[in-house]
């Protein structure tokens, strides 16, 4: 019923049957659950994870991500998670991660970083994310950034020479291959053309400024404080 309601399709509840066909033919599936507070979290999330374990144990991964909203939203019941709700999601997911390990010997469930930020809880340690296979889903971005910033982990996003990177496309209609067509987050072509800006050395009365969103601002401030970068200003931009 919930799936049919969310898809606005009376037959939507049966849509997952096609996953079994794909899995039976050795097609790798990386599933994603977009969690909407008051709609498909709580008992519904418990039922979803139980059903996936019982019927689709060979799923490569299951990413649980939060609902994204802007001021253009027209659905009155759609809203972001509260701190308490985010903490409850973390608790539920941790419980099911352990159950999956006991049942199938591996842990395919991954929780997006935003839940930890909203709940004001620390993100998991590096070992929790393995090789960080789901950065494009917002899973492990904070931990990978903190590790790279502190110099304790690899730069998983890759290094580009120059301040910007660009690619040349002969025609606007030409196809440009991306690494992950489901969630490309930037220009990562190995044949990119570097474009450098003139370096300006900051003066004492003109500190370096970092412009980022609300969640990024929290992470950035903590990272800067930990590394004693007291001459860097974080400018928070609220998403609307």
Across the structure, where does each feature detected by a protein language model lie?
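Hard-cation-handling environments
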Residues: 90-212
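Gly/Ser/Thr-rich loops at beta-strand to alpha-helix junctions
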Residues: 39, 67-70, 110-117, 213-218
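Short glycine-/acidic-enriched loop or helix-start segments at secondary-structure transitions
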Residues: 74, 121, 220-221
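Redox- and metal-dependent alpha/beta enzyme cores, enriched for Fe-S-associated oxidoreductases
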Residues: 195-240
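A generic structural motif
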Residues: 61-66, 109-113, 230-239
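Conserved AdoMet/S-adenosylmethionine-binding subsite of the radical SAM
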Residues: 1-101, 127, 141-142
């Amino acid at each position: 019923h919930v799936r049919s309601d969310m898809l606005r399709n009376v037959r939507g509840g049966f849509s997952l049957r096609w996953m079994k066909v794909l899995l039976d033919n050795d097609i790798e599936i990386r599933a994603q659950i977009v969690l909407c507070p008051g709609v498909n979290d709580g008992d519904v999330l418990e039922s979803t994870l139980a059903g996936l374990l019982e019927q689709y144990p060979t799923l490569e991964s299951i990413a649980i991500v939060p609902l994204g909203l802007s001021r253009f939203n027209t659905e009155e019941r759609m809203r972001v998670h509260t701190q308490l709700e985010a903490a409850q999601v973390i608790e539920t997911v941790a419980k099911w991660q352990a159950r999956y390990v006991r049942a199938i010997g591996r842990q395919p469930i991954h929780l997006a970083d935003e839940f930890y930020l909203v709940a004001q809880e620390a993100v998991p340690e590096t070992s929790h994310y393995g090789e960080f296979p789901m950065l494009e889903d917002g899973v492990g971005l904070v931990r990978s950034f903190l590790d790279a910033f502190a110099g304790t982990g690899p730069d998983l996003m890759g290094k580009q020479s120059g301040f910007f990177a660009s690619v040349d496309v002969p025609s606007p209609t030409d196809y440009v291959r991306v690494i992950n067509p489901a969630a490309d987050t930037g220009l990562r072509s190995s044949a990119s053309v570097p474009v450098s800006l003139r370096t300006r050395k900051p003066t004492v009365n003109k500190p370096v400024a970092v412009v980022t969103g609300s969640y990024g601002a929290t992470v950035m401030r903590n990272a800067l404080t930990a590394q004693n970068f007291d001459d860097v200003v974080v400018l928070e931009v609220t998403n609307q």
